[in-house]
Amino acid sequence: HSSFMGMSLPAPRRLLELACQSLLRDEASAIAALEWLPMELFPPLFITAFTGKHSRVLKAMVQAWPFPCLPLGALMNHRQSYQDILQAVLEGLDAMLAQDPRPRRCKLQVLNLQKRVHLEFWMVWAGTRAHVCSLLEPEALQPMRNRRKVHSLTARPNPPLAPVVVLIDLCLKKGVLDESLSYLIKKVSERRGLLHLCCKKLKVFAMSKQNTNILDMVQLDSVQDLEVNCTWKLSTLRKFAPYLGQMGNLRQFLLSHVFTSSHTTLEQEEQCVGLVTSQFLNLPHLQELNLDDVSILRGRLDEILRCLKSPLETLSITNCLLFERDFRHLSQHLNVSQLKSLSFSGLNLTIISSQSLQFLLERASPTLQDLNLDECGIMDHQFLDILPALSHCSQLTTLSFCENPISMMVLEDLLRHVVGLSKLSCVIYAAPVESYEETSSNINLGRLAQMHSVLKHMLQELGRPGMVWVCAYPCPHCGCRTFHDPTPIL
């Protein structure tokens, strides 16, 4: 049984399940019944056919599907293979596309293969027609707001030969494609123009010929969330850049692990950066930019900032090397004025002037909600310099600055500055330098507990006992982050 069938069922639903099982004992009769079967009974019958792997019935049901969307991915989990089922569904889709005009009952416009999407559709077993249909309103179906290549996904009947969208999350790696994806790509290739492959979430780990062929088939303006982990040569990153420029509805972008070899010339770096950053001109909806371990970023951050078309809500630049001029451009750029989340985790801020960081925080203070300064090497004097700017961040809810050499005196000063921020609910702070043993890098837990108690008492005295303060430090044995005192300061 599927996870939906395995739960304790009310009597009417149990009767419906038994009726579906009875109907499926004679597959020919079940297929014939699809012509007159009420649309409310399609979801429970499909689930039963899916669970029992009745491929012939599934193929026929796709051709008579009375809803604009078939959320097949919601029935799948990662622990099983659904090769036969997916093949049956795609064969049904193929048969439907071959017919002109389309089958009378079929309203299918989207085959959604995303996991954990539209789960509620399958949980409705016998609601009113309006209730069932309301679960798949056109707004819920559209992979993006503005579509250039793909027709609107409204609930109207398809005109003859209107394309059907196959919506899937893709992860393009090295190696051979799994059978299901390979079969899907084959069908999309055979039905070019009638099957549109759309992808909301795309991860790219390799740019093989096979993967570039897939990218050529994807409606790239359907991509909203992109992760590019490119431990590649710069020439490969240049090859990917034009694909990025076609993702006009991109909201989130993570670019990580961009390295240069000792043989890379400065001119080659400049050409690559110029080509990649120019693609940002075509991303007017970008809201979240994450740059992790990108070596070619140093001294060139302004090239990206100049090409951003709209203000970012999230900016994360982690494990990179930035110069003073990068921070100067960042703090002066208009696109930081609406930031909600800012992370510099793993940046070496000791080479950055306090004034640049202070000015940046001042610019972001009206909207900033989350600030991460973990492992930045910030020392007391830098932290003291930015405290006034921090105290102006009226929307701040979380502040994290683990693994920085901060003294207890500065921690107490910080607490006094931020205690008036009414929305600040969680502070993850660095173990004070005084809590370390003099002869080693180990934490003296007894000493740390005393300091934690001092902060707790200060919060109570200042009227903020509900603000959570948690200390985090690296484990001396494995290096993993350890949180001191699982009971936070309350």
Model-identified regions with their sequence ranges:
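C-terminal capping region of solenoid repeat domains
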Residues: 1, 5-8, 95, 126-131, ...
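Extended amphipathic alpha-helical scaffold segments
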Residues: 25-62, 356-359, 369-377, 381-403
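Conserved hydrophobic beta-strand positions in leucine-rich repeat
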Residues: 70, 106, 111-114, 122, ...
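Amphipathic alpha-helical interface segments within eukaryotic helical scaffold
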Residues: 222-231, 249-252, 260, 272, ...
